[in-house]
C-alpha cells in the first residue's frame, strides 16, 4: 500500500476497469427490487459545469447507496439536443469555417449539426467518467434518437386530436439574433440602466399648420412615457384610467402618432396605473404581452413595426431598414427637433436578454403552435402524489400549476423535432407522413422542453407499456434537479406523464440550489466567475470535488464554491488513507469473524457507534440529506474511529500487551470496522474507497458489495466509554489550566460501584495509563487511601488524586497567578505615583482629571493590599479549604 495518498494514481483507469467488468450494468434477472434514476439530460453543447457536477454526483451517491442496500439499480444516461443552443453553436462554428447558414440547405446544415452532436456527446461521456458516475451506457438515450423522435411526433398528433394543441397568434419572447421564439427559461433578466422618453401625442383637431415648438401656443396633447419609442409606429391607442379626472375629456378622442398622419383613439381601462408616469400609456399590441390582452378587450388590431431580425419594417416610414436601436436614436432626435419630445429620464429596469445570443429580447406577435395546459394542470394537481424534498417546493409547484398559461411549443429552427403538420392553403393536417405532393411540411420544430417533458418514460420504452423497462422501472424513483427549473421542466413532465401514462413520472423530486461564488454571485459565463470542474479535479481529484459538492449544501439551498473547502475535502480523504494504512500495517488477516465476547469496552462502544451511525445514515438517505450524512460520517471516521478508537487499538495490537487470542480478535474487529467505514463512504468517494477496499477484500469489488448489516448495540458500554472519554478530556483540560506538564506522571485512582465497569477498565488499564499520562492508575470500587481526594466525577465514575500532589499543583498555580497580579498592580501604582508627583501635570491638568487619577491610585493600592492578605492566607485553589 502506498505511503501517501495520490489521487492521480488512485483514479487513473479505475473507471475504465469498472466499465470493462460491467459493474454498472442493470440486471433484470436479479430478482431484486429495482431503483431507477434517469439523468436530467445535459445540453449537447459543450462542457459540463459545476452545477452539472453537483447534480450528477447527488444522483450517483443515491444510486450507489441503493445498490449497496441490495437494489437492482439503473442510472440511465442521456443528452438533450438543445435546439436553439446547439443550432447557434453550429452556426458559429460554420461561420469560423467561412460558411454562412443562409447559404446552406437545411439538409446540409443538419449534417453539420449531427457531426457536432457526435463530437460533443463524447466529451460529455468523458466528463461523466471523470466524475465516476455509475451509468449504464447500454441504455443511453438522445432526445433526437429515431425512436424518441417517433414518440414525440405521435404525442403531438394525439394532443392535436384531443384539441389540446392549436395554432394562433401569441406574444412570445423573440430573439432577433437567432430569429426564433424562446421559452421563459431561455431569457435572463438583468437590471439595466435605460431611458424613459416623454413624448407628446397631439389631438387630431389641433391645427396642423401651427409651429409645435412655439411656446406661446398651448397645444392640446397627451404625454406618454416609454422605454421603447421605436415601437410607436405599431401603436393602436393611447390609454388612461377611467377614474383619472385629468383625462376624462380626452376619452373617445383621437390623436396622431407623432410625426405621422396615423390616427389612433384614446381609450380607458383600469389596467392603467394613475400614479405611474403621466397616467397615459401607449398601446402596442404587437410588441407587448399586456397590450395584447388590452387589445382583445377593446377590439384593437395588433401590428408589427419590426422585422424578425430586429430591423424596422415599412410601418416605420423613413426609418425602414434601420436596426431598432439605431431607429430609436434617430427617432428621438427628430421628435426633439419637431416639438414632440418633452424630456428624458434615467430609468433602471429589468430587461430580458437571450441566454443563447445575449441579444435583448423583443416581445413579438407571432403565429405559433400552442399547447393548452390549464385542464392538464388541474388533473395533475388532483392526482399527483409526488414527494418533494424540501417540502416547501410543493407549494411553489402547485401554485405554478394553478396559474399556468398556455405553452408556446413551436420554434423557428432547423435542429429539433419536426412538427408533423402539413399545409395546403388554409388547410392543416397533422400526421407524420405526407398527405400528398400538394401539401407542404410545417417549417417549425418543437420546443426542446416538449421532448424533455417525455424524458422519464420515453427513455424506458413507452409507448409500449409492455416493455420490460417501462413495466419494471416506471415511475422512476427520484428526479434530482435545480429549483430554478421546477416550473419550466418538472411541471411539464408531471402533466405530460399523467396525461399520457396516467402515472406520476417519478416518486420523489429532490431539488438543489444554484452554485454561487464565494461572494454569493451566481456562476455564469457572462460574469466570468465560473469554475471548470475538470480543473478542480486535476488539482484535488474527483473524490475531493464530490465530497465538497455534496456535503456543503442542504437540499433546496445554494452551494457557495470555496476552494479552501475543496482542499479540506482532500485532507479528509488523506486522513482516511492514513487510517487505512495504519489498519493494513497492523493486521495480518482479511477475516472479519471476530468474537463479540472478547471485545474490550472501547470495541463494544465503537461497534455500537457504528450501528447507530449506520441507522442514522440510512434514515437520512430516505430524506436525501447528504450534507448531514457527510457530517455524521466525517465525525465518526475522524473523531470516534481515528482520534479515540485507534489510540486504544494501538494497545490492543501491541503483541507485548495482548495474548494471541485477543490480538487476533482485535485485528479481525479492526478489518471489519475498516471495511464497513469504506462502504459507508463509498457512495460519496468511490475511487479512493475502491482502492482502499482492495487491501481488505481480495474477492469482491466494493461496487458489488452489499452494506453489512449491524445489529450489535450495547448502549451501556457506549455510555461507560463516553464517561471515560469525558474524564480523559477533563483531565487534559485541568492539566492545561493548571500548567501541569503533560510529561508529569500522576498517581490516580478510578473508582466505581459497578463491577462490570471496573472489569472493563481493568482490561484497559495500560491504555488508560497512557491516556491519563500517569505513573500508575488503580481501579477500585472505593478509595483505598484516605489521603486521596476526589478530582473529577463523571456519572458512575470518580477520579481520585493524591491530596498532597493536588495541593502542590494548586499552590504552584496560585503562586503563578499571584506573581502575575502583583507585578501588574505594582506597575500601575508606580505609573500613578509618577503622574501625581509631576508638578506640570498638577498645574496644567483639569481638577477633575487630577481627581480621577487620585482615585485610580487609591484603588490600585487597595487591590495590592488585598492581594498580599490573600497570599498570607491559604491557597484559594486548595480543594480542602472550608
UniProtKB/Swiss-Prot annotation:
Its EC number is 6.1.1.9. Gene3D superfamilies: HUPs, Isoleucyl-tRNA Synthetase, Domain 1, Valyl-tRNA synthetase, C-terminal domain, Valyl/Leucyl/Isoleucyl-tRNA synthetase, editing domain. ATP binds at residue 525. It holds the Pfam family Val_tRNA-synt_C. Its main location: cytoplasm. Keywords: Aminoacyl-tRNA synthetase, ATP-binding, Coiled coil, Cytoplasm, Ligase, Nucleotide-binding, Protein biosynthesis. A motif ('KMSKS' region) lies at residues 522-526. CDD domains: Anticodon_Ia_Val (cd07962), ValRS_core (cd00817). It is found in: Cytoplasm. Belongs to the class-I aminoacyl-tRNA synthetase family. ValS type 1 subfamily. Catalyzes the attachment of valine to tRNA(Val). As ValRS can inadvertently accommodate and process structurally similar amino acids such as threonine, to avoid such errors, it has a 'posttransfer' editing activity that hydrolyzes mischarged Thr-tRNA(Val) in a tRNA-dependent manner. Monomer. This is Valine--tRNA ligase. It comes from Onion yellows phytoplasma (strain OY-M).
